[in-house]
A protein has these predicted regions:
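Short, Lys/Arg-enriched N-terminal segments with co-localized hydrophobic residues
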Residues: 1-7
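Non-heme Fe(II)/2-oxoglutarate
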Residues: 10, 14-21, 25-107
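A structural signal for short, well-ordered beta-strand segments and their strand-loop junctions
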Residues: 40, 113-116, 122, 191-192, ...
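Short catalytic/ligand-binding loop motif for oxyanion handling, primarily in non-cytosolic enzymes
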Residues: 48-51, 77, 124-133, 140-142, ...
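Non-heme Fe(II) oxygenase catalytic core, chiefly the N-lobe of the double-stranded beta-helix
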Residues: 55-58, 91-148
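Proline-centered turn/helix-capping motifs that create local helix->coil transitions or kinks
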Residues: 61-63, 110-113, 158-162
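Eukaryotic charged/polar low-complexity linker/IDR segments
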Residues: 151-153
Length: 205
């Protein structure tokens, strides 16, 4: 199957999956968070997309990824779509009008614009002992001259076990209380509304 056909399958199959979710229930959960909108949606992607992206990320050579070491964190990232075709197909699907409108309804944030430059986005990989220190995300995206409004993470972990660690913690504005600890189960999608002082990370290896 040529690239355009796969792209259309990703988009159509994700949109079909969206229709299986109870959007009103998701909205209630999202907006019931104590300080900011946050939700983890299990099995968000069709399984074949999870498998394709998981294999692509798993087999991506480390020398093709950027080493992320800011503020004591350690992880690897790649948003070069020329060498990750399945990531490219997925990004196109998640940038579609259908998905953006669904995301706007979920979050209540209107006039969302996907970032074509993938600033701070793309595949990310952590190895044993790697950490993501507790932090807040940057707000201003210079490349598009817009403020970040919504963040999304989709997990592609193969056979993740809970005792491996790596759950993503979300804290209160004083970094003292953990509101949510999100397990990185494969295929799950995490969404949150960007606001100042949304501290998150997995500081323990």
């Amino acid at each position: 199957m040529h690239g355009l056909g796969i792209t259309m399958n990703f988009k159509n199959d994700i949109f079909a999956k969206l229709k299986t979710f109870d959007i009103n229930k998701l909205k209630t959960e999202y907006h019931n968070h104590p300080e900011y909108g946050l939700i983890n949606i299990p099995e968000f992607l069709p399984q074949y997309i999870v498998n394709l992206c998981s294999s692509e990320l798993y087999n991506l050579p480390i020398d093709k990824m950027k080493h992320f070491t800011r503020k004591g964190s350690c992880m690897y990232e790649c948003n070069d779509l020329s060498i990750t075709p399945y990531q490219d197909y997925l990004i196109h699907a998640l940038s579609s009008t259908e998905f953006i409108k669904w995301l706007e309804e979920l979050t209540g944030v209107k006039k969302l614009i996907p970032d074509p430059h993938l600033v701070g986005a793309g595949y990310m990989k952590s190895y044993r002992g790697d950490t993501l220190q507790v932090h807040t995300d940057f707000n201003w995206v210079e490349e598009v001259a817009l403020n970040r409004a919504v963040s999304i993470i989709i997990y592609f972990n193969r056979g993740w076990l809970e005792d491996w660690g790596g759950s993503l913690n979300f804290y209160d504005s004083k970094k003292k209380k953990i509101y949510s600890s999100i397990k990185p189960d494969s295929g799950n999608m995490l969404v949150w509304t960007y606001k100042n002082l949304i501290y998150h990370g997995y500081p323990d290896p």
